[in-house]
């Protein structure tokens, strides 16, 4: 449960930060990092819950 919540918070924070700073600074450099960890977490929690 904590991992899911942390993941959700990270996603929300990442979106906000991207819109505020990284979007204008360097979106290409930030983009690969966020989806990378996102894919890893989703892949790990996929068997437990396909919804996430």
Swiss-Prot record:
UniProt-reported outcome of changing residue 51 to A: Loss of alkalinization activity
Chain spans, region Disordered: 25-52
Tissue distribution of the protein: Expressed in roots. Barely detected in flowers.
Biased composition (Basic and acidic residues): 43-52
One GO term (biological process): defense response
Sorted UniProt keywords: Plant defense
Extent of Polar residues compositional bias: 31-41
Result, substituting residue 47 to A: No effect on alkalinization activity
Swiss-Prot/TrEMBL induction comment: Up-regulated by the GmPep914 peptide, ethephon, methyl jasmonate and methyl salicylate.
The keyword Disulfide bond is assigned to this record: no
Consequence of substituting residue 49 to A: No effect on alkalinization activity
Name of the featured protein: Protein PROPEP914
Gene: PROPEP914
